Amino acid sequence: MLFRSVVNKPRLGCRQRGVPFTHPLQSLLQCYQCAKHDEHTSYGELGAAVPPFGCAFSTVPDMSHVLAVANEEGIVRLYDTECRDVQRLVVKEFMAHTNAVFDIAWVPGEHKLVTASGDQTAKLWDVKAGDLIGECKGHQCSLKSVAFSKFEKAVFSTGGRDGNIMVWDTRCNKKDGFYRQVNQITGAHNALDKQTPSKVKKRKPYVRGLAPSVDSQQSVTVVIFQDEHTIISAGAVDGIVKVWDLRKNYSAYRQDPVPAKLFPYPGNSTRKLGYSNLVLDPTGTNLFASCTDDNVYMFNATGLKTEPVSVFGGHQNSTFYIKTSVSPDGQFLLSGSSDHSAYIWQVSDPKVPPVTLTGHCQEVTSVAWCQSDFTKIATCSDDNTVRVWRLKRSSEDSAQSDKTETVGWACQKKCVPPSMAANLCTPGKPSMIPSSSLMSSPTPATCAPSYTGDLPMPSSTPVSALLPIPKLQTPQRLNGEGLGASPKQTSSSKISIKDWITRTPKSSTRADTKTPSPRKAFTPVEQYPSVSSTRVQMPYEKRAKRRLETSSEDVEHVCLDHCNCVMELEPGLKKAKLDLCSFSEKERDGSDDKCLRLSDLSRGFDQEFSPGPSTSFLINGTVNPPLSPLSELKSDLRDKENSSPEKNWLSALGHKFKSDKSSPQNKAASSPSSRNSTSKKHPTRNAPNSPVSVPTTPGSMRKICTYFFKKSE
C-alpha cells in the first residue's frame, strides 16, 4: 500500500542501531485537503439542495471505496470515491423513504444496507439492484440510530424517540409483510424518579397501535453492538451510557429495565446532558461517547471502572446530529462540530491540540473514516454538501492540488495557554472605587466554587462595572448639598432601579433634577418663604396624568388646564399620600384660606395655626402654594391603592364630614361669610380618642388634605 510505504519510509541520516525512524502519523494529519471535485451537493427529489444526515463507507472488501449518503428527503446515493469522472461518480441512487433518513448502516461484508427513517420504519436494501428486501415496523416515533453486530449479519438494533430499543433478525419470517422485533427494551432511558424502593413505579403494558406519549419517554439517540450479546445505548436527557445484555428478557418486567452496567454522567454541568453518538475502537476496548457538553469521553468498555479514561475537548456539540468515527488503527478520533469544522484528536495524548478540517460553512454533522484506507475521510454538513478529504502522499499530488481549486484544508488548532486567559480579564481600577470593601477586580473570590462551567468567563466582565461609584447618601444629605446643582445626564442604558420604578411610559429620564425618594412622602414638611409667581416646573409635572375615580358619584373632580395635580402614586408605596392642587397666581391672590402643616398633624393639632397668605409647602422637593377652598372641595378623589375597609378614626371623621356636607348648615358654610356661625357650633375638630363603629366603604374615603383646615372663630 502506498500510504504504508510513505509512513514506514526511513528518514535519511537517522538510522540508529539498525532501527529506522518512521514518520509519525500525527505530523501527517495536517496534510489532509479537499479538492473541488471531491465536494458533492446533496439534492432532493425536486432538485433542491437538502442537508445530508448520514454517511458510511462500505464494508465489502471490493467496495470499500463506495460511500453511502442519506439526506433529509429520504434519498440514498452511493458515491465512488475513486472515480474522477463526474458522470460516473454516483453509482446508485434510490428513494429509500418518504421522510428523512437519520442513520445508515452497512451489512457486514455484504452489498446490503439498512436505513433508519423518520417514518418510524427501518428498511433493508440490496444496493446493487436497488430493491427493498424487507421493512421493519414496531417503533412509534422516529428512528434515530441503527447498528449491526460484527459477528451477525442478520441481526441489527435500532433506537428511536419513543425511548425503545428493538432488536431485529432478518432470518425470521415476515408477519403481515414486514419484520417484527425479536427483543425489545422499553423505556431504556427514562428519567429516574425520586421514589422509595417500596413504591416502584409500574410501567403500563404496551398496547399495539397506541403510540406512547413522547413527553413521558426519553429519546434513545444512539445504539451500538459491543458483541453479539451486548448492546450499548445512550439517551438525550439522562446523561447515562447503559450496557444491556440481550440474553435477558426485559419485556417480562413491569418496571423500568435495569441495565447490566452503566456509565454515569462524568461532566461538570449542573444538569445531565445527553449523548449524540457512541463508537468503539477496532479492539472493542475503548468506548467514545460524544456528549452535548462539548466533550468526548473515553470509557474502558471492558473494565469495571465507570469514570472516563480520557476527555477530548475543543470542539462544539450543540445538536444530536453530530457523529464520531475512529481511524482504522484506532490511534485517532474524528468528530463533527457545530463551529463548521471537523476535529481529529490523538487518542494516546488528549492534551495535544486537535487538527481541524476547515472548509464547511455550516455545522459538520456526520463523519466517516474509511476503514480500509487511512487517507480518506468523509464529512457531511448542513451546507448541503458532502466532502471527501484526502491525504497528500507525494509531491506529485501536491503539485496537482495546486492546479485544482482547494475547498478544504487541515490545520493545527492553536491552544490558548492559561496565562493568556488570565490576561483577557478586564483590569481592575481600585483607585476609582471609594469603598475598600468592594471587589477591585473581576478575579474570583477565595471562597468561590472551583467549577465555573455555568458561570461567565472573567473576560466577559463589562467595563462599565468598573466605573466610579457615586457616594451613597441619604435623600436629606443630597438636598443639603444644594438643590440647584443638577447631576450629569444619565444615559438610557445606565438608568438605576429607582429611575425605572418612578418612571412612566411617557416620562423621560430625569436629567435636570435628582429623582426624589418615595420615602420623602413621610418626612416632615418644612415651610419656606413665599416664592415668585413664576414657578419652576418640576419633573412630576411632566408625568402622564391618570384620572382617578371620585369618592361619590355626585361629586366630580374637575382639573383645569393649568392645574398641577399629582394624582399618580409612586409604584410600590401602599401608604397614604397627599393630593395637592396648585392654581394660577390669579386664584392664589384671591384666596385667604388657612391650611395646616403636616407637623401640626403629627402633634395632634394642639397648637394654633395662622399662616400668612404666602404660606407654601415643600413636598418631595417641590414648592407648592397653599390650598384654596375651591381646591379643597374639588379634590374629592378616591385613591384605589390607599382605600382600606379598616375602621379607624380617619374613616369615621370622613363619614361625619360627609353627613355634615349634606346638611343645610354645611351648604351655608361653604361661603366665607358664614364660617363664623359654623365655627361656633364646632369650636374644635380634634381627632377622637377611639374609633367610631361606622360602616366604611371605598367610596367614602377622601383625601386627607380636604379634612383639616382651621375655622376662624
UniProtKB/Swiss-Prot annotation:
Q: Where are the WD repeats?
A: 47-89, 96-135, 138-178, 215-254, 270-309, 314-355, 359-399
Q: What is this protein called?
A: Denticleless protein homolog
Role noted for this protein = Substrate-specific adapter of a DCX (DDB1-CUL4-X-box) E3 ubiquitin-protein ligase complex required for cell cycle control, DNA damage response and translesion DNA synthesis. The DCX(DTL) complex, also named CRL4(CDT2) complex, mediates the polyubiquitination and subsequent degradation of CDT1, CDKN1A/p21(CIP1), KMT5A and SDE2. CDT1 degradation in response to DNA damage is necessary to ensure proper cell cycle regulation of DNA replication. CDKN1A/p21(CIP1) degradation during S phase or following UV irradiation is essential to control replication licensing.
**Record family assignment:** Belongs to the WD repeat cdt2 family.
Q: Which SUPFAM superfamilies match?
A: WD40 repeat-like
State the Gene3D superfamilies in the record: YVTN repeat-like/Quinoprotein amine dehydrogenase
Keyword Transmembrane helix assigned: no
Task: Cite the CDD domains for this sequence.
Answer: WD40
Short motif Nuclear localization signal, span: 197-204
Molecular function terms, GO-annotated: chromatin DNA binding
Complex and partners:
Component of the DCX(DTL) E3 ubiquitin ligase complex, at least composed of cul4 (cul4a or cul4b), ddb1, dtl/cdt2 and rbx1.
Q: Where is this region: Disordered?
A: 474-544, 604-623, 635-700
What species is given as this protein's source?
A: Xenopus tropicalis
Recorded GO cellular component terms are: centrosome; chromosome; Cul4A-RING E3 ubiquitin ligase complex; Cul4B-RING E3 ubiquitin ligase complex; cytoplasm; nucleus
Regions of biased composition (Basic and acidic residues) lie at 635-644
Q: Where is the composition biased (Polar residues)?
A: 504-516, 612-623, 686-699
**GO BP terms in the entry:** DNA damage response; DNA replication; mitotic G2 DNA damage checkpoint signaling; positive regulation of ubiquitin-dependent protein catabolic process; protein monoubiquitination; protein polyubiquitination; regulation of cell cycle; response to UV
Location in the cell reads: Nucleus; Cytoplasm, Cytoskeleton, Microtubule organizing center, Centrosome; Chromosome
Q: Which domain of life is it from?
A: Eukaryota
